[in-house]
């Protein structure tokens, strides 16, 4: 259902796989399109309360952002991101981004839906904790990701082209004496040593 229900505590929400609940400032999904621009909008998946300006913020019905209704910068849409289709037409979206969300998700569903809604040449940008790190091992994660997964998954490679990668050294790695960091370059350390890299950001273009 696509409705104009107000945000309410998650215990009162239907978590039917197709349920979509809009922020109370919208009467229907058309209002979301009007607010952000049909055919040129951007989506932030798993946005919580920190979605960037200009992005349609979407979060899970069971996520943290569904617990407190109508706070400032609340998501525009709550839905079951792991099962339901995104409420947007094919080839309609300029950019899909997520920050520390994919590791909590049913990854292939998210990737397939992101590919579907992105228009040709659209951008898919994501940040995830590096699997081989303390952040990557947090309880609640269901995906444990490094760049290796994205380079070796055939479906991802078919649908997306990796344009840029950035890796963030952990505080522990940066505390190593300079000569050790020269002996153990970061690229080697992030692959073979635990907790050398804590996060990666990858920017892709969609292949259509």
Language-model features: locations:
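Conserved SAM-binding loop
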Residues: 36, 40-132, 204
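A short linear-motif detector with a strong N-terminal bias
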Residues: 20-23, 33-38, 74, 104, ...
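S-adenosyl-L-methionine-dependent methyltransferase catalytic module, highlighting the catalytic core
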Residues: 106-113, 123-208
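Compositionally biased regions
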Residues: 11-15, 115, 206
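Class I SAM-dependent methyltransferase Rossmann-like catalytic core
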Residues: 2-35
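Residue-level marker of positions within ordered structural domains that often coincide
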Residues: 1, 50, 155
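A structural signal for well-ordered alpha-helical scaffolds and beta->alpha junctions
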Residues: 22-29, 42, 143-147, 197
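A general structural signal for short secondary-structure junctions and capping/turn motifs
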Residues: 34-35, 48, 192-195
């Amino acid at each position: 259902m696509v409705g104009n229900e107000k945000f309410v505590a998650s215990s009162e929400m239907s978590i039917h796989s197709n349920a979509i609940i809009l922020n109370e400032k919208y009467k229907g999904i058309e209002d979301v399109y009007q607010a952000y621009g049909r055919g040129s909008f951007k989506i932030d998946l798993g946005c919580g309360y920190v979605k960037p300006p200009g992005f349609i913020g979407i979060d899970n019905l069971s996520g943290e952002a569904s617990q407190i209704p109508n706070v400032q910068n609340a998501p525009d849409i709550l839905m079951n991101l792991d099962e339901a289709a995104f409420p947007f037409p094919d080839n309609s979206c300029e950019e899909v981004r997520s920050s520390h969300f994919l590791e909590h998700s049913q990854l292939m569903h998210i990737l397939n839906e992101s590919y579907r809604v992105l228009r040709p040449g659209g951008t898919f940008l994501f940040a995830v904790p590096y699997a081989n790190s303390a952040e990557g091992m947090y309880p609640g994660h269901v995906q444990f990701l490094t760049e290796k997964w994205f380079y070796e998954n055939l479906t991802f490679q078919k649908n997306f082209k990796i344009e840029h990668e950035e890796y963030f050294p952990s505080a522990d790695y940066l505390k190593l004496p300079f000569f050790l960091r020269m002996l153990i370059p970061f690229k080697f350390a992030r692959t073979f040593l635990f907790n050398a890299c804590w996060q990666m950001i990858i920017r892709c273009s969609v292949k259509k």
